[in-house]
């Protein structure tokens, strides 16, 4: 419903309330450990595709290596899908079975 305002000259102006924009849903991109993909390759993709500094990339790679899975980053759906596709293409070219998945972030109540 629009608010109505009348000025001194009798002109009526209607102002529509601003629509609240919803934040897009975010997704975690998960890296899964395997016995064949090298640690160096995982660090490379974390650095080049996910734009992490070397220390952060190494920390995440070690977490994935030790725990089986780890979060590479949190993105909107389209960005997450694009990053997964890019990494999987790079892995295939190097004949690595590196697997990535994505899952929705928990929404704030």
Task: Give the label of every model feature segment.
Residues 1-109:
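Terminal domain-initiation and capping elements
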């Amino acid at each position: 419903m629009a608010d109505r305002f009348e000025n001194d000259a009798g002109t009526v102006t209607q102002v529509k309330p601003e629509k609240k924009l919803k934040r897009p849903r975010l997704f975690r991109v998960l890296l899964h450990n395997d016995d064949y993909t090298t640690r160096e390759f995982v660090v490379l993709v974390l650095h080049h595709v996910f734009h992490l500094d070397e220390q952060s990339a190494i920390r995440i790679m070690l977490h994935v290596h030790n725990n089986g899975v780890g979060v590479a980053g949190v993105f909107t759906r389209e960005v997450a899908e694009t990053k997964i596709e890019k990494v999987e293409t790079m892995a295939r070219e190097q004949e690595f079975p590196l697997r990535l998945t994505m899952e929705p972030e928990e929404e704030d109540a």
